[in-house]
């Protein structure tokens, strides 16, 4: 038997050509008749060289048997679906954990397998859902947490953390929800590569990135007829250590093995003697693959073996370190690309009452306290970037100033800040002739206050702010251009240097003074510092300056030693913190940082970043707040290696 595959990584091409693939054939051996068990999954498992089976049963719950099918332990319940992960740490002990759907209760049960006693026992239940769950699958996250994906009859996929890997304790924390596929028959996660696979029964198998911080996108891995080789519906998925995907095809009386690392090439395995295989599960057994097959027509559990060496994937472990946020701001008021750029205003009279400003480019400027609570909002238009400076002589007194690039009015929106209270007030707009204003930052040289503003076409303008009675006007004093689209920028006032990002290229440096000066490209994007370059800010530590830049292409933040030839010290990510229930940050646009002590709680300052994908649970965008102490820890570890 030969099958012709015309599948590429993400696109079905009707005119493609591909070599014929010979089908393998393996015999089945009866493990159990369904008359006494009545279930749908036979999961082969292996622990310390010993082979076992996990069976689902409508009458007996979950059964653990030896390799010959002899019952060792069981639980109560009407169970049809399960998934399994071994070597999970709970309270200092190691267990196997089973997620099983009880059809009578309509709930997911979490069951542990104690390897010392070979006993199964239920340890918790997840909350009931409004729609019936159709499939479930474990995901062992890179942080060590164990989470579970479920897909329901409405097509909603939910991910929730079940085991806190850092505390080795059970938890129940909804991470994210999204609309997956209708009629999701099965799901499985490749923990090593971080892929979630969903089987849409009459369409094919879709692949998603499993990380909750990843962009929600999908690609078709293997399709049903007429667009692919699978005849009829797909009923079950499993994954091999090699990353190969097992796709059960009942009408073809077999299973497809899809090489997800090799252009999704597929090989078909005929299950000899089967009538309608509903599920095919697998485990590595030395140089072969042990298969567990449930046949829906005969009601039999069957066992088989495939002589195939499925070597575990060899992956490069990322050396990127991570920090966590201690708090997050109130989400903006609508979904979509809205939150963009933060700024930190320091209350020098009472630093613990400093403020965070944030732009909502669908609404205006927002003001938060240091715990992220929304204090005030100004509906002044689609403001994009914001910055602050201190002590301007204005209207007979000293006031702090915030400015923001306003895309609605093609202007610089000016705000005053009362130095002792943080009271924020909108003042006026300074018109520009930039067609599509974008990024903005400020520069202060003694009593001279400047604003740099750019457009999406790369054009930069520098304005001198001029107090004028009870208003502030702007005088255009300089213009220059970046080669392509910029956005984020920051000025080192003390050294009179402007740093600005060219999103696809890197970071440029030029004099901040209103003179004709040549820009120099000092930092280039690479495989670690990945475009787009977005937010920029400067952190000071032990008398040195460090530029922090958001690397939107891989959801990270690059740190560069400005006083050491702009050396890239390293990059870091912001991960979720289950204890505080604050998620990490991804797809970051703007950021702001200070090393100035902000009260007793933040003696080493603060980092604020925009979060493009707000999770725990899924919500509109917001900003994440990171204790500067964590930044100092990273810097110290990097500097010690120099």
Per-range role (PLM):
Residues 13-15:
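C-terminal motif of bacterial Sec signal peptides marking the signal peptidase cleavage site
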